[in-house]
C-alpha cells in the first residue's frame, strides 16, 4: 500500500502522526519545502520499506516531488507524489515547466508510478507530452471512462492522475470523497508485470 498526499501542512503531518498513521503505513518521506510549494508539501507513505527515499526526485518549478523505491516481490517501482502549479495565467509558465520537468523521467531507467494533482487533463498538450510513448494514465488504461476528481463536491474535471510505466497494470480504479478536501481521492490497485 502506498499513499501519496499533496498540499500537506506540517500541522497535518503532526495530526497524522498523532492519529497513528505509522501503525498502518510506517514508512514515509516528505518533500523539502521550497518557495514553489503549492499549498503545502508532497508526502509519500508506504506499508513496505522504502529504498532511496528523496525529498525531491527531479528539479521541478513547483512543489518538490517526494519519491521512494518500493520492492514488489523482486520488481522495484519508483513512486513519486506530484503537484504542479495550476495553469492559471500568472502560473502558466511554471505549470508548463513543471510538466516538462516531469516528462524528463521518460529518459530514466526506473519503473515509475507518479501520483497526485497534475492540474492537467487530456485536453492539455503538456500532459500528453508528459505521458509520451512511455507512460500511461491509469484512467486511460482502466478503460472505464473519466474519473472526475475536482472539485470534490460536484467534480467536473479529471486533474488528479496516477501516471505509470507500461510495465504496471491497473486493476480497480475509483474516486472517493474525503471530508475537508477540495479534491476527491483517486484509489487504484496496481500490478507490476
Q: Model segments located where?
A:
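Soluble catalytic domains of enzymes that build or remodel membrane lipids, polysaccharides, and related
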Residues: 5-193
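Active-site metal-binding motif and surrounding structural segment of the metallo-beta-lactamase
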Residues: 1-2
Amino acid at each position: 500500500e502506498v499513499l501519496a498526499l499533496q498540499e500537506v501542512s506540517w500541522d497535518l503531518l503532526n495530526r497524522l502522526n498523532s492519529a497513528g498513521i505509522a501503525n498502518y503505513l510506517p514508512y514515509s518521506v516528505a518533500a523539502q519545502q521550497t518557495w514553489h510549494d503549492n499549498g503545502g508539501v508532497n508526502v509519500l507513505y508506504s506499508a513496505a520499506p522504502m529504498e532511496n527515499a528523496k525529498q525531491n526526485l527531479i528539479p521541478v518549478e513547483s512543489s518538490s516531488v517526494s519519491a521512494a523505491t518500493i520492492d514488489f516481490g523482486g520488481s522495484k517501482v519508483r513512486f513519486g507524489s506530484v503537484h504542479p502549479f495550476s495553469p492559471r495565467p500568472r502560473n502558466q509558465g511554471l505549470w508548463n515547466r513543471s510538466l516538462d520537468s516531469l516528462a524528463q523521467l521518460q529518459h530514466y531507467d526506473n519503473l515509475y508510478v507518479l501520483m497526485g494533482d497534475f492540474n492537467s487533463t487530456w485536453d492539455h498538450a503538456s500532459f500528453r507530452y508528459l505521458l509520451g510513448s512511455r507512460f500511461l494514465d491509469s484512467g486511460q488504461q482502466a478503460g472505464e471512462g473519466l474519473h472526475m476528481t475536482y472539485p470534490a463536491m460536484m467534480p467536473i474535471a479529471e486533474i488528479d492522475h496516477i501516471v505509470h510505466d507500461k510495465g504496471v497494470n491497473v486493476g480497480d480504479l475509483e474516486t472517493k470523497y474525503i471530508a475537508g478536501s477540495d479534491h476527491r481521492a483517486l484509489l487504484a490497485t496496481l500490478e507490476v508485470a
